[in-house]
């Protein structure tokens, strides 16, 4: 009984050991979206590992899809047995290259030299896993964007700085701001503040209008400005008062 149990356990391990080392079919390296300038070179990687430890036939095809709709980065499509080439292909799709190997691992890099603007589009790596009973199709896509060789660098940062400066608090015009001269602590008054003073001085130095009398004090050391009188009686009174004061001061 003991030998029979050991024999059964050994048979179980022999039958299930391959399953312990089997892994799911997956991409080990996929192409990524990239942006380059015209005239540059680029490589797009694509590597795949099949499931199980049994040797299969694997095939990689690189396709160029000009106006294809972006799909999932990795997609698994199982076709019916016997229909190995049942793959949905866009009308604008163009096959670039094909590589086929015997085994569980396959890899193929797409190399593009001297890229031009018309090379822009979606590039798709298709892997066909040919098994005994069915064929599995795996796909990985990447977008290639090509910019002009003479295009300026990205200006978003500069535009953001310009936007911040323009949206900041507005200050007075530097021409109207009081700016002290070197060595002079007194600030120069703004231009708009000088305008009323100049107009006042001009009006005070102008001759009086008709009907108005001006009495100028001629006392020594007196810096008093002109005094205007509109009433004739008041004018005579001030004139007499001025003469009396002058006589008193001289005596």
Swiss-Prot record:
Q: Which InterPro entries match?
A: Ig-like_dom, Ig-like_dom_sf, Ig-like_fold, Ig_sub, Ig_V-set, IgSF_V-set/TM_domain
Q: Which compartments is it annotated to reside in?
A: Membrane
Q: Membrane-spanning regions, if any?
A: 227-247
Q: How does it sit in the membrane?
A: Single-pass type I membrane protein
Family annotation (SUPFAM superfamilies) = Immunoglobulin
Low complexity: bias regions: 166-177, 195-213
- Please state what the protein is called: V-set and transmembrane domain-containing protein 2B
Originating species: Xenopus tropicalis
Organism phylogeny: Eukaryota, Metazoa, Chordata, Craniata, Vertebrata
């Amino acid at each position: 009984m003991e030998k029979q149990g050991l024999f059964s356990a050994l048979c179980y391990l022999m039958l299930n050991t391959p399953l312990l080392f089997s892994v799911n079919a997956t991409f080990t390296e996929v192409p990524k979206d990239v942006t380059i300038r015209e005239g540059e070179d680029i490589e797009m990687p694509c590597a795949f590992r099949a499931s199980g430890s049994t040797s299969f036939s694997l095939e990689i095809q690189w396709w160029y899809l000009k106006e294809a709709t972006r799909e999932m980065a990795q997609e698994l499509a199982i076709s019916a047995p016997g229909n190995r080439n049942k793959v949905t292909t866009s009308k604008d799709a163009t096959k670039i290259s094909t590589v086929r190997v015997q085994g569980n691992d396959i890899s193929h890099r797409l190399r593009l030299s001297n890229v031009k603007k018309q090379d822009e589009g979606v590039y798709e790596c298709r892997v066909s896993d040919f098994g005994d009973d069915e064929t599995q199709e795996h796909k990985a896509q990447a977008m290639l964007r090509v910019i002009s060789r003479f295009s300026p660098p990205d200006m978003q940062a500069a535009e953001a700085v310009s936007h911040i400066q323009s949206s900041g608090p507005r200050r007075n015009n530097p021409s109207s701001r009081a700016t002290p001269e070197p060595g002079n602590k007194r600030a120069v008054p703004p231009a708009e503040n000088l305008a009323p003073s100049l107009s006042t001085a001009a009006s005070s130095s102008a001759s009086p209008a008709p009907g108005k009398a001006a009495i100028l004090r001629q006392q020594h050391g007196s810096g008093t400005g002109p005094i205007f009188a509109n009433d004739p009686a008041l004018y005579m009174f001030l004139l007499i008062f001025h003469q009396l004061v002058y006589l008193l001061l001289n005596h």
